[in-house]
């Protein structure tokens, strides 16, 4: 809350509209930060009051709120609690929800995808936000990553790729990860107890991703149920089993 002219009455309230405390603020006042979900009321004390409100959000939600992107993937948000800013490849970046989030935290981001309109959108947002993100067109099926990285992230991507290329793709990802670096993969599964309800070109089997990374340190691994942003005929987000893995290259 910033006051440019005159004064206002700020009232802090309970959820049932009971007054907790009141303050009169002017342009000279040291106005405290209004906490999220804090009930309050603002009352002008003059007819010519000039003021404005600025709304803040967490970094993980900033780009989704401002540019109507999906939020940064929850596993990427979780991973940065372990991984400090470093050289990262967002493999299959889409419109850049994860690349933008990582870049805003100080990561040196390269973002690649085959979707040219999505890449252009990412370039536009990065320019508007003054973020230095290297954006490139790349067919993941070629398994031809050239540079090495400290962190390679590929969330909700493998299931859209050519099944015959998966072995080479994962090998290439692993080879281009520096020792001590990390891979984050989240991808759809199809298992006996939970057949995949969508016709993805590729789905992981039980323990398949874990086996690919048997020589790595598994920081996190599960095969839990999750939801796609895509909805079914009733408007419910589609539920299926995902392999979720954060692994560290130790040799």
Residue ranges and their predicted role:
Residues 156-157:
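Short catalytic micro-motifs in class I SAM-dependent methyltransferases
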Residues 1-9:
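Short, conserved beta-strand element in jelly-roll/cupin
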Residues 86, 150:
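Conserved acidic residues
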Residues 36-57:
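Ligand-binding loop in jelly-roll beta-barrel domains
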Residues 153:
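A conserved beta-strand element that flanks and buttresses the S-adenosyl-L-methionine
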Residues 58-83, 89, 95-133, 137-144, ...:
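Class I (Rossmann-like) S-adenosyl-L-methionine-dependent methyltransferase catalytic domain
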């Amino acid at each position: 809350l910033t006051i440019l002219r005159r004064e206002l009455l700020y009232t802090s309230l309970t959820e049932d509209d009971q007054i907790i405390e009141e303050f009169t603020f002017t342009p000279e006042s040291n106005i405290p930060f209004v906490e999220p979900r804090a009930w309050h009321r603002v009352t002008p004390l003059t007819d010519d009051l000039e003021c404005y409100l600025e709304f803040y959000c967490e970094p993980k939600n900033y780009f989704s709120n401002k540019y109507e992107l999906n939020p940064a993937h929850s596993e990427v948000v979780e991973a940065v609690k372990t991984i400090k800013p470093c050289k990262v490849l967002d493999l299959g970046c889409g419109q850049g929800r994860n690349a933008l989030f990582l870049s805003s935290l100080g990561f040196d981001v390269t973002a690649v995808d085959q979707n040219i309109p999505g890449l252009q959108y990412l370039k536009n947002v990065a320019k508007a936000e003054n973020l230095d993100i290297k954006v490139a067109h790349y067919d993941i099926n070629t398994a031809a990553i050239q540079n090495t990285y400290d962190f390679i992230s590929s969330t909700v991507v493998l299931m859209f790729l050519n099944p015959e290329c998966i072995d080479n793709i994962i090998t290439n990802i692993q080879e281009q990860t520096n020792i001590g670096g990390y891979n984050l993969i989240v991808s759809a599964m199809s298992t006996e107890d939970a057949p995949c309800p969508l016709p993805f070109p590729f789905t992981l089997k039980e323990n398949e991703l874990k086996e690919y990374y048997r020589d790595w340190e598994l920081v996190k691994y599960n095969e839990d149920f999750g939801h796609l942003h895509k909805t079914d005929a009733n408007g419910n987000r589609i539920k299926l089993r995902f392999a979720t893995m954060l692994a560290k290259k130790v040799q």
